[in-house]
Regions:
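Short, conserved beta-strand element in jelly-roll/cupin
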Residues: 62-66, 76-91, 130-132
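N-terminal post-signal-peptidase region of extra-cytosolic proteins
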Residues: 45-48, 63-69
Length: 157
């Protein structure tokens, strides 16, 4: 029995590695690449976890925004879902009051509704964005408007 166990023990890592090559594995844990400074202020990193293709109708992108970074107003032709996995942020739809997002929150931006999301002044935010199609950028989010939201939603110390 002992003689059979030893060879199997040493072969196990190779079997596991061989199995992984049969699958298309991605990880949202990787930071991604620094995004070009377009349609936002501050710093952002994007990890395109999954890209839509002929067999998949949506994208999943992990986005990390450093504290005090903002994303401009935009909309999508189909609903977008944001899943906050780290930090805290802000979210606002046109014509509605802004809200503060925290780890574990999931929010759905309805199709064709202008909205923005960003990190808080104090904390980075990381979220998974699940969406289809292109993003349509509609308006620059002014620093004064972001600061007003930050002051309104500031957590008491």
């Amino acid at each position: 029995m002992k003689k059979k166990f030893v060879p199997l023990f040493f072969m196990f890592p190779f079997v596991v590695l061989a199995q992984n090559s049969q699958y298309n594995l991605n990880s949202y844990l990787e930071q991604g690449t620094k995004a070009p400074n377009t349609h936002y202020l501050g710093e952002a990193w994007l990890n395109r976890v999954l890209q839509a293709d002929e067999n998949l109708s949506f994208n999943i992108t992990k986005a990390t925004f450093s504290a005090n970074s903002t994303l401009d107003w935009h909309k999508h032709s189909e609903s977008q879902v944001l899943v906050v996995v780290d930090g805290s942020g802000y979210y606002q739809e046109k014509g509605k009051n802004p809200i503060r997002l925290k780890v574990g929150d999931i929010i759905r931006a309805p199709a064709n509704v202008e909205h923005w999301h960003a990190a808080t002044k104090e904390n980075d935010v990381t979220y998974l964005a699940i969406y289809s199609g292109e993003t349509q950028w509609t308006q620059v989010l002014l620093r004064e408007d972001y600061d007003r939201v930050a002051n309104t939603l500031k957590v008491p110390q």
